[in-house]
């Protein structure tokens, strides 16, 4: 039994209800992502696996691409060295996943899928990926989401089988690639007391009308642009499928015409054997594009809902 088969069999025992992240880790992720912008540099998550929860207590960024090339040091060696340093100072060094910054939550791609699969297949089925969106966070709402691959998708990815028949057999749609895990931000009692004081001081502010600002046209435009790009890419994938089907049909037509000219009957078994096997395009790209389009529509829906709420409040204030 190889490691992939063992991972799939044990997946049902890896129930994960919540991911608890220290507030300091959230601040470190935001700070590290801001320092490396516009480059999107991912990083490692460290913590503990406790029952049906995952506790994230520390993190560190991976080396940027240019530094990695200059030092000729692989990311794996860098991770091992960092975790060795953390163990020396008695800090949790257990890998529980990784984080990655993204623009407009556009992280549904094959690179992320492959990285997350390797984490779950080789380290722990409960390993997660935390996605941070600096653009959406700049709009006033912390955008931090946690995902891991589903069991059904892990099975398909292990076999690299994403044909139409295999997807139908597994009953897998674009919604079945990732499962989202709830995030709980945890702070110490001292930090909670400090935040309580800050919250009390902010309540003394007399003017909070700036929160009703709805001039986020740039954000909405970027989301629509991203959706348009995904739709164009999806159309290209559909064209590949159409060309593949047309080539198969051309082979069948040529065979039937040849038999007709020879005055012979068409043998279905012979026809099936005469058709040259064509490699159909993988449906993985189409699944990821569809998932990303669905993600963009959710963002537009959320943006529209918040804007309508603000408009309603402004209307009441004008009365």
Curated annotation (Swiss-Prot):
PROSITE patterns the UniProt entry points to: MPN
Gene Ontology cellular component list: eukaryotic 43S preinitiation complex; eukaryotic 48S preinitiation complex; eukaryotic translation initiation factor 3 complex
Pfam families membership: eIF3h_C (PF19445), JAB (PF01398)
InterPro entries: eIF3h (IPR027524), eIF3h_C (IPR045810), JAMM/MPN+_dom (IPR000555), JAMM_MPN+_peptidase_M67A (IPR050242), MPN (IPR037518)
Keywords noted in UniProt: Cytoplasm, Initiation factor, Protein biosynthesis
Main location group: cytoplasm
Example GO biological process: formation of cytoplasmic translation initiation complex
Cellular compartment(s): Cytoplasm
Database matches in PANTHER family: EUKARYOTIC TRANSLATION INITIATION FACTOR 3 -RELATED
Function: Component of the eukaryotic translation initiation factor 3 (eIF-3) complex, which is involved in protein synthesis of a specialized repertoire of mRNAs and, together with other initiation factors, stimulates binding of mRNA and methionyl-tRNAi to the 40S ribosome. The eIF-3 complex specifically targets and initiates translation of a subset of mRNAs involved in cell proliferation.
Family: Belongs to the eIF-3 subunit H family.
Protein name: Eukaryotic translation initiation factor 3 subunit H
Organism: Dictyostelium discoideum
């Amino acid at each position: 039994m190889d490691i992939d088969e063992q991972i799939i069999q044990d997946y049902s025992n890896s129930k994960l209800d919540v991911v608890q992240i220290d507030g300091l880790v959230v601040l470190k992720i935001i700070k590290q992502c801001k320092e490396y912008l516009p480059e999107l540099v991912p990083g490692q998550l460290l913590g503990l696996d406790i029952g049906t929860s995952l506790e994230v207590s520390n993190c560190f960024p991976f080396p940027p691409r240019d530094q990695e090339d200059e030092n000729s040091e692989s990311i794996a060696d860098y991770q091992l060295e960092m975790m060795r340093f953390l163990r020396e100072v008695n800090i949790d060094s257990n890998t529980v996943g990784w984080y990655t910054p993204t623009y407009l939550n556009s992280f549904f791609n094959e690179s992320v899928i492959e990285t997350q699969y390797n984490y779950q297949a080789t380290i722990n089925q409960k390993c997660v990926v935390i996605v941070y969106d600096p653009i959406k966070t700049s709009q006033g709402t912390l955008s931090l989401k946690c995902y891991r691959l589903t069991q059904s998708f892990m099975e398909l990815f292990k076999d690299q089988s994403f044909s139409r028949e295999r997807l139908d057999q597994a009953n897998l749609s674009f919604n079945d690639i990732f499962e989202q895990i709830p995030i709980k931000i945890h702070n110490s009692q001292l930090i909670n007391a400090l935040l309580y004081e800050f919250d009390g001081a902010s309540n003394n502010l007399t003017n909070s009308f700036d929160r009703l600002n709805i001039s986020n046209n740039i954000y909405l435009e970027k989301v629509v642009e991203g959706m348009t790009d995904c739709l164009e890419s999806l159309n290209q994938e559909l064209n590949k499928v159409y060309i593949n089907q047309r080539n198969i049909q051309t082979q069948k037509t040529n065979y039937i015409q040849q038999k007709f000219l020879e005055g012979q009957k068409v043998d279905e078994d012979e026809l099936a054997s005469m058709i040259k096997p064509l490699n159909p395009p993988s449906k993985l790209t189409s699944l990821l594009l569809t998932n990303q389009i669905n993600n963009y529509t959710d963002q537009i829906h959320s943006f529209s809902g918040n804007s309508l709420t603000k408009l309603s409040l402004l209307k009441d204030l004008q009365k």
